Amino acid sequence: MNAYPYIKNIDHEKVLKIADQVNADADQVVSKTLAQNDFVSVTLFAFSKGEDISTHDSIGDAMVTVIEGCGKFIVDDKEYIVNQGESLVMPAKKPHSVHAV
């Protein structure tokens, strides 16, 4: 393992399925941070259907990839439906929210 792991909380040098790294719990959003520094943040989220993250913005761009299911993303008042295997980039400083559908 690296002396300073830039990517943490996940096995290094091991083939894995990203969907197996975080599991949804009923009535809550579960997160697992994989990388966090001044330049990048990588976090896995798992949502049960009906759960959401309320409107907020961030200082950097945010990229989401839906691993399973479907999500409704509102970015600057525009709605996007993102399905399994699809991704969406949400620009920095634009308000956005996430809803598991």
For each feature predicted by the language model, list its residue ranges.
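Glycine- and acidic-residue-biased ligand/ion/polar-headgroup-sensing regions
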Residues: 59-72, 76
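Short acidic-glycine-tyrosine-enriched beta hairpin
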Residues: 77-92
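Short, surface-exposed secondary-structure edge patches
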Residues: 44, 63, 78-81
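Asparagine-centered strand-capping/turn motif at beta-strand->loop junctions
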Residues: 100-101
